[in-house]
Amino acid sequence: MTVAINNETVVLTPNEDDVQVNKGKTLETSFPPLKGDDLKWFPRSSLPAEIPAIDIGKVSTKEELEQFLVDIRKSGLFYIVNHGVPEEVSINVYNAFREFISTTTEEERMKYYTDTHFQNGGYVPFQGSSIRGGNLGKPQKDHVVKYFWRGPEVINRTPNEKFTEAHNMHHTETFKVAEKVIRTIFKALKLRFPDFDPMEFENTINSKKMFFTNRIYPQAEPSDEEEITHRLVPHLDTSFITLANQVPADNGFQGLFVETGDGKKVKVPGIRNSYLVFIGQSLSYLTKNYLPSALHGVDKPPSDLFEGSERSSLITFYEPAEIIIPSKNINPNPEETSESCPFFYDIGLTVNDPEGTTWDFVKNKFITGYYAD
């Protein structure tokens, strides 16, 4: 199958049968480097009410922490602004991946393709994964190409030193943001649940527990045998929290969306040098569904917005500690909760289990269905 991307020819063909993990699709194209000043960012004023923009450095007083807790429970998704990470950190890591895709063949990329991406990074080809399959649903292949990165404390698969430096820098800087967000969440929880001791979850804060995926959603149409509803189907992350940086499509198409508890679908515009925070199912599980995980996905563009709909994102997953036990000191009222960790229930767990589980168990259950057939 052949499609046009940025006036260039893109050939999408099945990989050879001996490729590891799955067959995916071959993506032969080039992606020009991004320049922050040239991207069509949305103003902060365009954010819907369901997605607050929070200056995490200004959340410290009792009143600020109480409002923070109200804000993050609206949809399980919020923007962090004034976070201290220079824009060039994200632009450089986007461009490192874009250069990798643009200057290599699919055969060369397969050197970095493996079924242990979650441990020490690596490349995942276009349609090489299924977030719905990982969440135990009917698989739909993800219309995205990815590179996983575990961080500087792990030896990652990497094509070159420049690629390594850009990815390590992004990991290092976003870990600082994630840690600040997590500690602020702990402080806010203690206001609502005075017996809660943040030290209970202290083992969560570890840079080795964080990895990210560098993603490109190319302007590629589905093949004739496919029926797709989304570029990435609606899902709930299994993470503790997820940080996301996104750049907008050239044509203004807003692909990323979140669904609120009342079923309202809210588009998430790309705000310059800002990080989205998604509450994940692990944090919902540990707080007995008090903090709602964010149901989100990426829409496919309608035919009139197909041209110019390519977009990129950096999705950072912060994992919980290895032992996951719902806090005995967080006991929300029934009206304060929502069913926010269905994957945990689907694999036989409950928030009322005093024994809890292990992250290894949860992760391996997810990975079983993640790689597309």
Curated annotation (Swiss-Prot):
It catalyses: N-(7'-carboxy-7'-demethylgeranyl)-L-glutamate + 2-oxoglutarate + O2 = isodomoate A + succinate + CO2 + H2O; N-geranyl-L-glutamate + 2-oxoglutarate + O2 = dainate A + succinate + CO2 + H2O. Its EC number is 1.14.11.-. InterPro entries: DIOX_N, IPNS-like_FE2OG_OXY, IPNS-like_sf, Oxoglu/Fe-dep_dioxygenase_dom. Induction: Up-regulated under phosphate limitation and by increasing partial pressure of CO(2). It is an enzyme of class 1 (oxidoreductase). Pathway: Secondary metabolite biosynthesis. Residues 204-320 form the Fe2OG dioxygenase domain. 2-oxoglutarate binds at residue 311. Fe cation binds at residues 235, 237, 296. One of its GO terms (biological process) is cellular response to carbon dioxide. Binds 1 Fe(2+) ion per subunit. Its cofactor is Fe(2+). GO terms for molecular function: dioxygenase activity; metal ion binding. Keywords: Dioxygenase, Iron, Metal-binding, Oxidoreductase. PANTHER family: FI07970P-RELATED (PTHR10209:SF881), OXIDOREDUCTASE, 2OG-FE II OXYGENASE FAMILY PROTEIN (PTHR10209). Iron/ascorbate-dependent oxidoreductase: part of the gene cluster that mediates the biosynthesis of domoic acid (DA) and derivatives, natural products with neurochemical activity acting as ionotropic glutamate receptor (iGluR) agonists, thus being neurotoxins causing amnesic shellfish poisoning (ASP). Catalyzes the conversion of 7'-N-carboxy-L-geranyl-L-glutamic acid (cNGG) to isodomoic acid-A. Also mediates the conversion of N-geranyl-L-glutamic acid (L-NGG) to dainic acid A. Belongs to the iron/ascorbate-dependent oxidoreductase family. This is Alpha-ketoglutarate dependent kainoid synthase. It comes from Pseudo-nitzschia multiseries (Marine planktonic diatom).
